[in-house]
Amino acid sequence: MGRAREVGWMAAGLMIGAGACYCVYKLTIGRDDSEKLEEEGEEEWDDDQELDEEEPDIWFDFETMARPWTEDGDWTEPGAPGGTEDRPSGGGKANRAHPIKQRPFPYEHKNTWSAQNCKNGSCVLDLSKCLFIQGKLLFAEPKDAGFPFSQDINSHLASLSMARNTSPTPDPTVREALCAPDNLNASIESQGQIKMYINEVCRETVSRCCNSFLQQAGLNLLISMTVINNMLAKSASDLKFPLISEGSGCAKVQVLKPLMGLSEKPVLAGELVGAQMLFSFMSLFIRNGNREILLETPAP
């Protein structure tokens, strides 16, 4: 009995000693872990403080957010016109690119003449004695996007009004024809008046010196009529040969423009001016060595 009791007490002592050693070990390791956690927490806090100090310079550039384009007008940020921007799609983490619609005015402009532009041009013509400046104003003809080879009718009518005031003509019928387009509200009546005097306008245009204001006004009137009425078909057939064979380069270009306009809309010209006749005039230009003039004709 005494021997068994001693063995029992020995086993109990070993168990108590092992438990005490384990407790001491856990207390030591736990203190080290807590110190490491505290150090990591302090490092994270320092990082957060540094980010808070840098955020105003990095993330909040309000000028860039309000104006997402460069000084030259080029868009450099996501969501620019004609580009794409990332939007989160529902139900998932992935982002999808969505097209951005083209922005309207002031990002796109139209090349047209307003009433104020015409008034300013008329004032410049009245005050300027320089023939070069006057010619530049009269020859300015914005293109009509719906009819590539025709010119904007309003700009032609404005140039007619300016040419009428600048270059008087002895023929009263020509003056009446140049005055007729002034009343835009009575366009049908104006077309009738122009039709009465169209032959005189063609004769006066051919007889005048090349590149004169009156010749330019007559050609502008004829170009306008190719767009709105077929009255030019017969008159153009009488006009084009003298100017193409004897006129200057500018006159040849101006005569070829209404011909190309008529060929683009054959309903207006009927059978008088068609693709075959236009081809014959192009051949005439090529035979005379005026290829550069032919290349300038479709240009604005």
Swiss-Prot record:
Transmembrane segments: 7-27
Presence of the UniProt keyword Nucleotide-binding in the record: no
One Pfam assignment: Arm_2
Coiled-coil stretches noted in the UniProt entry, renumbered to this chain: none
Topology Cytoplasmic: residue spans: 28-300
Keywords noted in UniProt: Membrane, Mitochondrion, Mitochondrion outer membrane, Signal-anchor, Transmembrane, Transmembrane helix
Function (record text): May regulate the dynamics and distribution of mitochondria in neural cells.
Family: Belongs to the eutherian X-chromosome-specific Armcx family.
Record protein name field: Protein ARMCX6
Source species: Homo sapiens (Human)
GN (gene name): ARMCX6
